[in-house]
């Protein structure tokens, strides 16, 4: 969970004014980061033709970083450097560092990315690997960490897990000839609620400790935006002899993480949401150092290491090209790599990470807490539970959520409200049957963005056709 220790921000009476929002922007120490991104224009987001960015001075309000982050300006520079390397020196790009390029030689690129990602997730550099995509990485990690026995075979997960997680777990159970109806345990909220309390999760762990082998939860629940207490849940589950994994798709680049200190067994994430690495970008995985050790006590040719699905790129670089078919894994998460990673994908990833390298998750989280609290304050301002046609289903506690607020609309409102928002140049995510997921992102969103969004959102709710 986040290390934010301050209480929930309190806003003055004039917080509903555009002038107040502008004053928050003027005092924002991260304001300059917005200029490191290409903000889509209002005209372009509603256009059906391919358009060049930067032709309009009227940017949209982009609150969809929880689905896909926007493009860093560095991306084009990094991609151009990668293409120039390929065109100018060909295969030598694997082994030669070029002066003037922001990128290392190709065989070191994944390590360059992993070193930066490790700071985002609170890990040692060797505990992180830049590779694959989220679901593929979850499959690799489950193959290594899920070790069912006749008595301990269950996997615990949340009741509304993203389908890829659900499918991955089902397939691993089937791989071991287990019935998901017997071996998959869904942890859900109380009837009529959306938040799953830590106490309820711990009670499920207690209830199934004798028969469960592993628990896999999201760091942040994608639908509700709830941030789980990763540290407490991890420690408790491990005390009951469960292996603990985390899907950090919505936590990476969003909240402070300390995976090493929290003793997490394994984790995986994508990088295209708050990470801004591009659609379908390369993902990352974490394996705690205690699981990534390679023991040579019985000789150089008899390494002992945690079982995993192996590939040549996970072999130690010093022997990778010896072709003797004696696998000696890279110590740490790098030993889970399979194939030569795409240098083009890594260029996009490294470009996005170059922005994070200029700040810290602590600073980003500080602004994020303020942005989301301001959004919540304006949404609830001058309304009551009885009068407002929506409910915020994300926890009110800043330490139990990330950037996102999930706004549940009354039945029948979602399509029209979503259409009105898009017509107004606002990009946010909708989830059936009635949720608008709004995610102000500290790297490129402003408090004025929040003010404008709420003004337009409430105006959309006041449209006559929505009141009938």
Curated annotation (Swiss-Prot):
Q: Where in the cell is it found?
A: Cytoplasm
Residue runs in coiled coils:
none
Entry's Gene Ontology cellular component terms: cytoplasm
- UniProt KW keywords: Cytoplasm, Hydrolase, Pyridine nucleotide biosynthesis, Pyridoxal phosphate
Q: Name one GO molecular function term.
A: kynureninase activity
Q: Cytoplasm: is it a keyword of this entry?
A: yes
Q: Kindly state which reaction or reactions the protein catalyses.
A: L-kynurenine + H2O = anthranilate + L-alanine + H(+); 3-hydroxy-L-kynurenine + H2O = 3-hydroxyanthranilate + L-alanine + H(+)
Q: What is its main location?
A: cytoplasm
**Which residue ranges does UniProt annotate as crossing the membrane?**
none
Per the UniProt entry, the Enzyme Commission number(s) are 3.7.1.3
Q: Where does pyridoxal 5'-phosphate bind?
A: 134-135, 162-165, 247, 250, 272, 312, 340
Metabolic or biological pathway:
Amino-acid degradation; L-kynurenine degradation; L-alanine and anthranilate from L-kynurenine: step 1/1; Cofactor biosynthesis; NAD(+) biosynthesis; quinolinate from L-kynurenine: step 2/3
Q: Which domain of life is it from?
A: Eukaryota
Q: Which GO terms describe its biological process?
A: 'de novo' NAD biosynthetic process from L-tryptophan; anthranilate metabolic process; L-kynurenine catabolic process; L-tryptophan catabolic process to kynurenine; quinolinate biosynthetic process
Q: List residues modified as N6-(pyridoxal phosphate)lysine.
A: 273
Pfam families on file: Aminotran_5, KYNU_C
Keyword Cell wall biogenesis/degradation attributed: no
- What is the annotated signal peptide range for this record? none
Write down the required cofactor(s): pyridoxal 5'-phosphate
Q: PANTHER family annotated for this entry?
A: KYNURENINASE, KYNURENINASE 2
Which HAMAP family did the record assign?
Kynureninase
Q: How does it assemble?
A: Homodimer.
Annotated function:
Catalyzes the cleavage of L-kynurenine (L-Kyn) and L-3-hydroxykynurenine (L-3OHKyn) into anthranilic acid (AA) and 3-hydroxyanthranilic acid (3-OHAA), respectively.
What's the family? Answer: Belongs to the kynureninase family.
Name of the protein in question: Kynureninase 2
**What is the source species?**
Aspergillus oryzae (strain ATCC 42149 / RIB 40)
């Amino acid at each position: 969970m986040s290390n934010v220790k301050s209480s929930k921000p309190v806003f003055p009476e004039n917080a509903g004014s555009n002038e107040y929002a502008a004053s928050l922007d003027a005092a924002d120490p991260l304001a300059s980061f917005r200029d490191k991104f290409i903000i889509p224009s209002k005209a372009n987001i509603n256009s059906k033709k391919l358009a060049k960015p930067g032709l309009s001075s009227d940017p949209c309000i982009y609150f969809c970083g929880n689905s896909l982050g926007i493009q860093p300006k560095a991306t084009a520079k990094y991609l151009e450097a990668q293409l120039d390397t390929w065109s100018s020196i060909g295969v030598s790009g694997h082994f030669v560092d070029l002066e003037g390029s922001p990128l290392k030689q190709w065989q070191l690129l994944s390590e360059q990315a992993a070193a930066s990602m490790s700071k985002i997730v609170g890990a040692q550099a060797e505990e992180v690997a830049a590779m694959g995509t989220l679901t593929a990485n979850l499959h690799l990690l489950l193959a290594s960490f899920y070790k069912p026995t006749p008595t301990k075979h269950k996997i615990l997960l949340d009741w509304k897990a993203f389908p890829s997680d659900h499918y991955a777990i089902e397939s691993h159970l089937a791989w071991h000839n287990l019935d998901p109806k017997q071996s998959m345990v869904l942890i859900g909220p109380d009837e009529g609620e959306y938040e799953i309390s830590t106490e309820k999760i711990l009670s499920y762990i207690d209830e199934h400790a004798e028969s469960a082998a592993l628990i896999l939860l999201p760091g942040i629940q994608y639908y509700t935006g709830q941030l789980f207490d990763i540290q407490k849940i991890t420690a408790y589950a491990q005390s009951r002899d469960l292996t603990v994994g985390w899907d950090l798709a919505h936590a990476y680049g969003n909240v402070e993480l300390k995976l090493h200190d929290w003793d997490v067994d394994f984790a995986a994430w994508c990088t295209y949401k708050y990470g801004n690495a591009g659609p379908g970008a390369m993902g990352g995985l974490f394996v705690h150092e205690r699981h990534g050790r390679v023991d040579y006590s019985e000789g150089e040719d008899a390494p002992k290491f945690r079982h995993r699905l192996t590939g040549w790129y996970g072999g130690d670089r010093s022997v990778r090209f010896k072709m003797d078919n004696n696998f000696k894994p890279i110590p740490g998460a790098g030993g889970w790599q399979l194939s030569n990673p795409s240098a083009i994908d890594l260029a996009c990833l490294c470009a996005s990470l170059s922005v994070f390298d200029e700040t810290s998750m602590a600073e980003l989280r500080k602004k994020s807490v303020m942005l989301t609290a301001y959004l919540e304050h304006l949404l609830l301002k001058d309304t009551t539970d009885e009068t407002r046609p929506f409910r915020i289903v994300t926890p009110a506690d800043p330490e139990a959520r990330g950037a996102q607020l999930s706004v549940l609309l009354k039945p029948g409102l979602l399509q029209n409200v979503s259409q009105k928002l898009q017509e107004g140049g606002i990009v946010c995510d909708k989830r059936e049957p009635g949720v608008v997921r709004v995610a102000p992102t500290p790297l490129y969103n402003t408090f004025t963005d929040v003010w404008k969004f709420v003004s337009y959102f409430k105006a959309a709710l006041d449209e006559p056709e929505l009141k009938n």
